[in-house]
């Protein structure tokens, strides 16, 4: 089709031990939680997530082709201008029928009546619920239910809002909003309000998955939309009822770039839960930060993580001097409430009183986009135009990212993670190019 594009691009099969199912869920937000901010172009009306869930490999599973990576019925961003965006549009037209490698089947149930862990993922700027599908789907293939958020704070590349509470109203598109000056005072206000907006979305998504676990439905009173028909989603939600670990202090929060900064914001937040009489940050057991963008962390003076945290840094971001120096300073902050003057360097990485340690790893040859599907799907020529020059094999980068992420969960006692114990994935200089740097 010209320009070196291929219409046969495929996403890799998820490499964990279990097949994976998926659906998109959009839930109306209760009126009292429909927050709005001056810097964000619309009120929070719905919350939209892609849910990845593990399936039982001993039962029949059928491949599906209906969960599309680039749903064209939602459009290509109208805001896109200039050669770089034109190139992306042209390439995207070759992905019209690209489907996620997911299946229809029965939910996996851990042995001994165990419950499935729940993992919430927040995307970065110009991301979406689908852009990190290989990462999120592979995490799910280890027996974890993953909620991939689609944020409506003008940070997603494009998002369509369909409010099922008002079906008579036409859907509308939330466009990506460029930041013209990252260091302006107005940008600090924007970053803060975006993070508050994202936190609200994550709170509502968390309550939604709790409702599924407790009631077998996302909400008993509010309507919702799904990417599958009612017989399909009712079967999925009923199978999840009573089988998810949604207890306070047992959830995992993760994100890429601005999504990783979102995790830091939640960790340091003094916001109460919308639905419970405790602080929202106490919902989480541990965190995984992929290429955290430190500018909003520094601008908003966010404290170090309260939870055991794995950080995976791309080679590109390690060479991003301002960001990496800010990360080093943040992690060894001597004023952190859980650190003492006599601590060793490794102990200064501990951000909880129980001496559970964080890890910071880098994989040689990777770029900022390596946490996403883009290096797999975009030709090298396109990434070169977009200034994404990578040397690492994108499939191998995905494998080591997910192996280390899953092993980190095992080592922090997240129960019922499937697959073999893999301690080498959190050791330095055993896997070529994989190095612990702090």
Curated annotation (Swiss-Prot):
| A cellular-component GO term for this protein | cytosol
Tell me which UniProt keywords the record has, alphabetically: Cytoplasm, Hydrolase, Lipid degradation, Lipid metabolism, Nucleus
Q: Which reaction does it catalyse?
A: a 1-O-alkyl-2-acetyl-sn-glycero-3-phosphocholine + H2O = a 1-O-alkyl-sn-glycero-3-phosphocholine + acetate + H(+)
Q: Name one GO molecular function term.
A: 1-alkyl-2-acetylglycerophosphocholine esterase activity
Tell me the domain of life.
Eukaryota
- GO terms under biological process: cellular response to oxidative stress; phospholipid catabolic process
Top EC class for this record: hydrolase
Gene3D superfamilies in the cross-refs: alpha/beta hydrolase (3.40.50.1820)
Recorded E.C. number(s)? 3.1.1.47
Database matches in InterPro entries: AB_hydrolase_fold, PAF_acetylhydro_eukaryote
- The UniProt entry lists the main location of this chain as cytoplasm
The family annotation for this protein states:
Belongs to the serine esterase family.
Q: What is this protein called?
A: Putative phospholipase A2
In its UniProt entry, the species of origin is given as Schizosaccharomyces pombe (strain 972 / ATCC 24843)
In the UniProt record, the gene name given for this protein reads plg7
């Amino acid at each position: 089709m010209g320009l070196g594009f291929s219409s046969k691009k495929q996403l890799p099969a998820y490499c964990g031990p279990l097949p994976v199912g998926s659906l998109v869920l959009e839930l109306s937000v209760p009126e009292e939680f429909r927050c709005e901010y001056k810097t964000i172009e619309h009120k929070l009306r719905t919350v939209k997530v892609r849910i990845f869930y593990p399936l039982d490999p001993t039962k029949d599973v059928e491949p599906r082709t209906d969960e599309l990576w680039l749903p064209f019925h939602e459009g290509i961003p109208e805001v896109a201008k200039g050669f770089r965006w034109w190139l992306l549009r042209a390439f995207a037209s070759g992905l019209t029928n690209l489907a996620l490698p997911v299946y229809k089947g029965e939910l996996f149930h851990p042995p001994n009546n165990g419950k499935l862990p729940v993992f919430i993922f927040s995307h970065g700027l110009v991301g979406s619920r689908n852009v990190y599908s290989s990462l999120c789907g592979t995490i799910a293939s280890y027996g974890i239910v993953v909620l991939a958020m689609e944020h409506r704070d003008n940070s997603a590349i494009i998002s369509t809002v369909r409010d099922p509470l008002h079906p008579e109203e036409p859907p509308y598109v939330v466009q990506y909003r460029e930041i013209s000056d990252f260091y302006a005072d107005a940008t600090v206000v924007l970053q803060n309000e975006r993070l508050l907006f994202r936190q609200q979305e994550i709170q509502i998504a968390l309550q939604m998955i709790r409702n599924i676990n407790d009631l077998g439905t996302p909400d008993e009173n509010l309507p919702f939309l799904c990417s599958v028909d009612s017989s399909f989603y009712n079967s999925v939600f009923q199978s999840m009822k009573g089988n998810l670990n949604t207890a306070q202090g047992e959830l995992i929060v993760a994100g890429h770039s601005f999504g990783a900064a979102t995790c830091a914001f939640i960790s340091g937040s003094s916001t109460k839960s919308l639905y419970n009489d405790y602080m929202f940050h106490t919902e989480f057991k541990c965190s995984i930060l992929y290429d955290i963008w430190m500018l909003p962390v520094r601008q908003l003076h966010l404290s170090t993580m309260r939870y055991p945290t794995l950080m995976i840094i791309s080679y590109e971001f390690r060479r991003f001097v301002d960001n990496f120096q800010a990360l080093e300073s943040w992690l060894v902050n001597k004023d952190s409430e859980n650190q003492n003057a006599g601590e060793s360097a490794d102990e200064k990485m501990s951000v909880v009183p129980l001496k559970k340690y964080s890890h910071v790893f880098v994989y040689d040859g990777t770029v900022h986009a390596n946490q996403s599907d883009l290096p797999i799907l975009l030709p090298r020529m396109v990434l070169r135009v977009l200034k994404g020059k990578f040397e690492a094999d994108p499939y191998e980068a995905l494998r080591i990212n997910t192996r280390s992420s899953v092993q980190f969960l095992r080592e922090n006692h997240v129960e019922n993670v499937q697959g073999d114990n893999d301690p080498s994935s959190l050791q330095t200089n055993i896997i070529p190019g994989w190095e612990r740097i702090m």
